[in-house]
A protein has these predicted regions:
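Short, intrinsically disordered terminal segments enriched in charged and Pro/Gly residues
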Residues: 149, 201-215
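Conserved G/P- and acidic residue-centered "switch" motifs that form tight phosphate/ATP-binding loops
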Residues: 139, 157
Length: 215
């Protein structure tokens, strides 16, 4: 995966609602931008993304492929969203830890945030800048994330705290948040197997989606 869009469009091969504003020339194939959304020049959006009503994507923001941006989400400069990420309605991303209206910041003075591939960010979540959200992590609605999140972790509350782990299939795993390293678990829904590793869970046995068979 790369958060760099797969295509730079020289002709329109994506959809823009008549009441949306798209100034960027880097929008991937089959992406859809809906009413009152604004994508600024210098933003990079991959293929097959869905940008909901009233979303805002600032110059310098990067979205990978197949990203879902629900209504009212704002994505700022120095925020990178990898492939297959879901951003729920009105979730909030930031890029300045100590803002003042009279202090203007840009570029390297802003704080980067990375949301890794396949993560889910619930409605009304706030993500304080400077963190990494791990792959397949699941941030519950209304949570406030103030530190980096491991792969597959389930986070809820204010401040956000880990209460468990989520499977690739988006079901909660029967494994406590504080499970020791090398602890293992199998998802009762899809039969994928995982082990606790540095940085979160690691898949040790994959399945064929929809068939429940080992590869």
């Amino acid at each position: 995966m790369s958060a760099t869009p797969s295509e730079t469009t020289t002709e329109r091969n994506f959809f823009v609602h008549p009441q949306a504003l798209v100034e960027s020339t880097e929008i991937g194939r089959n992406t859809r931008v809906w009413a009152f959304a604004h994508v600024m020049r210098g933003a990079r959006v991959g293929a097959d993304c869905n940008i909901g009503d009233h979303a805002f994507i600032e110059s310098g923001a990067i979205l990978g492929n197949n990203v879902t941006v629900k209504n009212g989400v704002a994505i700022w400069d120095r925020v990178t969203i990898e492939d297959n990420v879901f951003l729920g309605p009105n979730c909030v991303l930031t890029n300045d830890l100590n803002p003042r209206a009279y202090i203007k910041k840009s570029g390297s003075t802003l704080v980067p945030t990375l949301i890794r591939e396949n993560a889910t960010i619930g409605a009304n979540v706030t993500i304080v800048c400077g963190v990494t959200i791990g792959q397949y992590a699941f941030i519950g609605a209304g949570a406030v994330v103030i530190r980096s999140v491991p792969d597959f972790a389930l986070i809820v509350g204010n401040p956000g705290r880990q209460i468990g782990w989520m499977c690739v299939c988006a079901e909660k795993l029967p494994l406590p948040a504080g499970a020791a390293r090398d602890s293992s678990v199998t998802c009762p829904h899809c039969r994928r197997s995982f082990v606790v590793a540095p940085g979160g869970l690691s898949v040790v046995e994959e399945v064929l989606i929809g068939k429940g068979e080992n590869q």
